[in-house]
Amino acid sequence: MPKSYTPVHDSIPEEDHFSSDDESNFRLHRIDRSASRSQSPKENEGEPSILAPLVRKSTDFETYLDSLTEDEQQLLSASKDHDIEDLDRFGDGTAAARRRFSESKKRRKLLAKRGGWRAVYYSKTWWRTLVVVIIALGLLVWGFLKYASTRGDIWEEYDMPGPDSYFPTPKGGTLKHWAESYEKASKLVERMTLIEKVNITTGTGWQMGINSKLTISGPAALVGFPSLCLQDGPLGIRFADHITAFPAGITTGATWNRDLMRQRGAAIGLEARLKGVNVILGPSMGPLGMMPAGGRNWEGFGSDPVLQAVAAVETIHGIQSNGVMATAKHYIMNEQEHFRQPNEWGIPYALSSNIDDRALHEVFLWPFAESIRADVASVMCSYNQVNNSHACENSKLLNGILKDELGFQGFVQSDWLAQRSGVNSALGGLDMSMPGDGLHWADGRSLWGSELTRAALNTSVPMERLNDMVTRIVAAWYQLGQDSWESPAPDGDGGPNFSSWTDDEFGFRYPGSPGDTSAARVNRFIDAQGRGEEGHWNIARKVAAEGIVLVKNVGGVLPLSRSPRANAERPYRVGVYGDDGGPAAGPNICTDRGCNSGTLAMGWGSGTVEFPYLISPIDALQGAWQSDVQMTPYLRNAVMPADTSDKDLCLVFVNADSGEGYISAGGIHGDRNNLFLQKGGDTLVHTVATNCGGPTVVVVHAVGPVIVEPWIDLPGVQAVLFAHLPGEESGNALLDVLFGDVDASGRLPYTVGKSLEDYGPGAQVLYEPNAPVPQVDFSDALYIDHRYFDRNNINPRYEFGFGLSYTKWELTNMKITRLQRNPSRLPAARPPDAVAPPSYDANPPLANESVLFPPGFRILSKYIYPYLPTLEATTPPPPNPEASGSATDQKPHRTKPSDAGGGAGGNPSLYEEVARIDLTVQNTGTRSGQQVIQLYVSFPHTVTESSGQKSHENIDFPDRVLRNFTKISLAPGQKMDVNMTLTRKDLSYWSVREQNWVLPKDEFYFWVGYSSRNLPLGKPFDP
């Protein structure tokens, strides 16, 4: 009997085992059987078999190879053909050739396992992979070139120069109401070291704070300036415990209620302060909603620049009333999720949003200008490019428009990894780099940090610019009174008291640093929501209720009765249908709400929060009726006709979700694929409405407009409510409107078209790249949303500003009063700076050991430091001998300041009131209610500008534009006198030729009414 066979791989560490089908194993078995026929067991006992390796002590593979016997080595290397050929039983060399080939394969495998270059050279898998990669790359290039050849006309269309430049960056501290803060800041900054200045401008890196999404890299400890905590977001405090999940921005915009907008902002600000947050990353006013399918439209307030601006201003006032810095984001033209970030979609470049100067000013800049008038402390620049220049280094946008023309006094921070260069972004107007990491997440390599220290020393970034960056940040801190903040109760230390990365009380101090295990108390579980009737749930519920828009109500089916007339023989039967009507497996079941499960109360992405609780519609409906009512839930989107036919009332819940591009859910990659209901919602409504024994009421929870054409005209669909994204009080707020506890007073913050095409070619998301740098053309941007419908005579299903009420209204006695006599065509001359900005020593400090890591300094992996490892490349360049005069005599080129500037939000004369509109509003119905009075302006029909020596250019305008609104509450029969004003800017257009706002000297027409197409009052006005 042959000696027992020990497989070769039994003595190799587990990770180095051969596969079960390894051919070398099979060959050894064959040879073993062959040898056993010519040798007896006795003969084999005295010498080791070449087929059975000795017992090995070492498990290291290379040691194992070195310990092979000579016979084993000869077999494995196949170095002596005649030794193998002796085993040839066929005698014709065929078997020998096969064995040589087989042993050569074994040799390659063994050498491949030795590591190093041999592992690569002898690895068949590696070579196969290389071939596949080369073929794939070839196909990719071929396909890309083929696509390019078919789309050449489009590529050529975008072969355009970049934007105008604006240098140097205007200094902050030129407006009187910021003067005191800048004076304090300058005294602090002039005492800072270079290291401290850089430290303030650069984030510490992703997950490098113990408590927050991000903490600005270390404090300026020597002068007492703290680290600052920046935290999302637009509808509450992201990642935090014991906070309120407020209704989303789109719901807030649908209230058209300035007071509620401010209350919501104040509550968010108070919760941020109690949680130790210095800067809240909201409100969002970009995207504006040019593309109705845009993934993050729901974070903003609606698809109109004036509505968006009013809501943003009220939110900012609310947040900053509690001493927390608000952030106006995303600046600017961040209108879709596809291709907004480099590398996120497999393309190395972010898309470019291409926009003309007039549309930029009149549409997309409008909310930002108003936010700056409201003294917003921070502006966040966006990921995308604008006219082929990254938004976070676009000097025209940051220096020219934001800091010069609009007079922004706060600081510009990058969106997380939106910074794409070091020196260019500093010179272009960026003041703070977030999260500190450079071109890739959590790699510990910053474009600023130590590189900004080096750039300041070698004068690539002038000290004048660095000092302004730091001063802007510190001045904003003083402006909000954060120098006098008390420590958060009960035992805070002035910093954030919650963790973004764990729900446990104790956790890692630097969770983003591999290998660091230092721990700290990271969660103090401080309740910031408020208690009882003063709790913030009450504000959330009011906003959610007033954000519900009633768009259809046949026969007054709503409001519902809590005591419906029951059939004498059976109880009143109510069916509740749809997954959206019930709870999910948990309100926070998906990270950043990245799934559509259960009732939809917010979209997904970084603009979300953790629900402390979520009242679903079915939860609220359980105790809604007072009489004998039998309610049966069918919380699924597939129902049978038999489930509906015996019901006296059918409530159908459907939705449409979207969010940020880093999450994909249900086949939606950020931006919606279309405007239809999701998860079979259209079929569900059709099935229920055509079979229900009574009226069908449809409730739509959606991130924006949805196409309702498949079912809106069905006789069974008697009421429809757009409930938007209502937050934690979803079900309770819905019942307030369903049963008439409050009036249906929401109004659409967008237009509901009959198809996606109704919104125009410029409103379509770019789903496939059309160039190496994807290009999105906003040539129709002046005609956003309802303006496009009006210009092209398209009948929408429901127009912008539309919404039904439970009562009736009448508008009368419209009167226009001139507040200025013969106002000039152009605004007044730009006023000089009210105060001089701070001045510092412009010379860089000496490059010495003060900028190096201190001796014995403990360096955390991936943490962003301002220190340099060496003094390499810190020497300023020598002066140019050909330049005349000394270096200090040389003055850099300075772009001429804008005539449209001179104050917060622009030239102060732009905001002088030129007209007042008075009217009387009466509630002529039988119920108390609320009404939104909307004021629209039509510009003169013929406005021309000189475009040359002889020719004149006709200036085109939208049919009418929203310019003001107010919301009132009246009892039955009650009257109220209402007035609204218009400013010079409201009646001006942006002249590209004159680079200023121009007031046409011809007849305007002012409209007053209930929506963009229901305007019963109107009068001409000649300024």
UniProtKB/Swiss-Prot annotation:
It catalyses: Hydrolysis of terminal, non-reducing beta-D-glucosyl residues with release of beta-D-glucose. Residues 1-128 are cytoplasmic. Glycans are attached at residues 199, 387, 458, 497, 848, 964, 979. Its main location: membrane. GO terms for biological process: cellulose catabolic process; glucan catabolic process. Residues 827-838 have a biased composition (Low complexity). It comes from the Eukaryota. Residues 150-1023 are extracellular. The active site is at 415. Keywords: Carbohydrate metabolism, Cell membrane, Cellulose degradation, Glycoprotein, Glycosidase, Hydrolase, Membrane, Polysaccharide degradation, Signal-anchor, Transmembrane, Transmembrane helix. Residues 1-51, 485-515, 822-841, 873-909 are annotated as: Disordered. GO terms for cellular component: plasma membrane. Pathway: Glycan metabolism; cellulose degradation. Pfam families: Fn3-like, Glyco_hydro_3, Glyco_hydro_3_C. Its EC number is 3.2.1.21. PANTHER family: BETA-GLUCOSIDASE, BETA-GLUCOSIDASE E-RELATED. Beta-glucosidases are one of a number of cellulolytic enzymes involved in the degradation of cellulosic biomass. Catalyzes the last step releasing glucose from the inhibitory cellobiose. Belongs to the glycosyl hydrolase 3 family. This is Probable beta-glucosidase E. It comes from Emericella nidulans (strain FGSC A4 / ATCC 38163 / CBS 112.46 / NRRL 194 / M139) (Aspergillus nidulans).
